[in-house]
UniProtKB/Swiss-Prot annotation:
GO cellular component, one term: respiratory chain complex III
Topological type in the membrane: Peripheral membrane protein
Database matches in Pfam families: Peptidase_M16, Peptidase_M16_C
Binding partners and assembly: Component of the ubiquinol-cytochrome c oxidoreductase (cytochrome b-c1 complex, complex III, CIII), a multisubunit enzyme composed of 3 respiratory subunits cytochrome b, cytochrome c1 and Rieske protein, 2 core protein subunits, and additional low-molecular weight protein subunits. The complex exists as an obligatory dimer and forms supercomplexes (SCs) in the inner mitochondrial membrane with cytochrome c oxidase (complex IV, CIV).
Protein name as annotated: Cytochrome b-c1 complex subunit 2, mitochondrial
Lineage: Eukaryota, Fungi, Dikarya, Ascomycota, Saccharomycotina
Species of origin: Candida glabrata (strain ATCC 2001 / BCRC 20586 / JCM 3761 / NBRC 0622 / NRRL Y-65 / CBS 138) (Yeast)
Length: 364
């Protein structure tokens, strides 16, 4: 028998449902659509579609959606990344039926009124871009994805107004991605039977049939590349390593190792991240400082240390612990045989900031 904290997975009428029932009064409901930037037919269209979520639908205004949720003590949001557009609601457990209906209503009945694009959606998207551009680590990561994958995962996540997107483009893209086969429903603090019941009775069942875009996703990988971006402010040096799905366990352990005191230079790292996709993974680590010479010295130390063999087997338990907090993973991750890691010369490198003082890849 599964304990209350364990995951329950099931498939209902094409879409998948994953739940983790926990004690307490709070619940989180997520609808994850394989509609992130890697699937975009125009740069930034996934970001704009995400920003269209919780606008006016055919049955409720955007204001009514917000006010009803506030009265119930809940909140909703829509976010975008490279793999997903994610609709999320946080609420008291007893309000599960309302939020299942609210999220299904957004996917099925968003009205895409023409005036909302220039008046609400694009200004919000420009704000998102301005916030992201103020973060040099985000910019470095963006460069790494672009040189590592070019298209697909290398597409820009956020709308930058370079390529024009019309309301008809958004309608067409939404009809392609908002299908039964292309969504995953996750519940935390939610009973599986209850969630399945309310989902079955909701407009999720009225979504059209389509295809699971993730099943055909295949990334072309490029290694040994670098990119540089001059900007005012803090400087960042970042390393990116594309990872085959068979090596997810090893790099999950490496992420845990680099993020912990097990790695002697962990204090020099500003961010370590291992992101898993259905077909590939990507590990990045970054050094950031207001003084570019400090960044240069520290990234050389970190890369130099990693070019020596590191025993990462002692980080597997930490990696399993972190993995256990995730609601879902695109593949089964196994840690059998995780032992040593040694950085080879296939890594990619990005420098952002005062790049005249930052090293080139072949100087690491």
């Amino acid at each position: 028998m599964l304990s209350r904290g364990q995951l329950l997975r099931s498939s209902a009428r094409h879409y998948s449902i994953v739940t983790k029932d926990l004690p307490g009064n709070l619940s989180v409901l997520r609808v994850k659509v394989h509609a992130g930037s890697r699937y975009a037919n125009k740069d930034g269209i996934a970001h704009l579609l995400s920003r269209f979520n919780f606008q006016n639908t055919n049955t409720k205004s955007a204001l009514r959606l917000v006010r009803e949720s506030e009265l119930l003590g809940g909140c909703t949001k829509s976010t975008v990344d490279r793999e997903y557009i994610t609709l999320e609601a946080r609420f008291l457990k007893e309000n599960l039926p309302y939020y299942v209906n609210a999220l299904s209503n957004v996917l099925y009945k968003t009205s895409f009124r023409p005036h909302e694009l220039p008046e609400s959606v694009i200004p919000a998207a420009k704000y998102d871009l301005a916030v992201a551009d103020s973060n040099p680590i985000f910019q470095a990561e963006d460069l790494l994805y672009n040189i590592s994958f070019r298209n697909g995962l290398g597409n820009p996540v956020l709308y930058d107004s370079v390529e024009k997107v019309s309301i008809d483009d958004l309608k067409e893209f939404s009809s392609k991605v908002y299908t039964k086969e292309n969504i995953e429903i996750e519940g935390v603090g939610i009973n599986e039977a209850d969630l399945k019941k309310f989902v079955t009775e909701s407009l999720f069942n009225s979504l059209p049939q389509g295809s699971n875009l993730a099943s055909s996703a295949k990334s072309e990988i490029f290694t040994g590349k670098e990119s540089r971006l001059r900007r005012i402010g803090e400087s960042v040096a970042s390393v990116g390593i594309p990872v085959a799905s068979k090596d997810f366990g090893k790099f999950q352990a490496l992420e845990a190792y680099l993020s912990s005191e097990l790695f002697p230079l962990t204090d020099l790292l500003s961010e370590v991240k291992f992101t898993k996709y259905p077909d590939v993974g990507f590990l990045t680590f970054s050094v950031k400082n207001g003084d570019a010479t400090v960044v240069s010295e520290n990234i050389k130390k970190v890369v130099g240390e990693l070019k020596k063999s590191q025993d990462i087997s002692k980080a597997t338990e930490l990696a399993k612990l972190k993995l256990g907090t995730e609601t879902s993973s695109p593949v089964d991750i196994k840690f059998d045989g995780v032992k040593d890691f040694k950085l080879d010369d296939k890594f990619n490198f990005a420098a952002v900031g005062d790049v005249s003082k930052l090293p080139f890849r072949d100087q690491l």
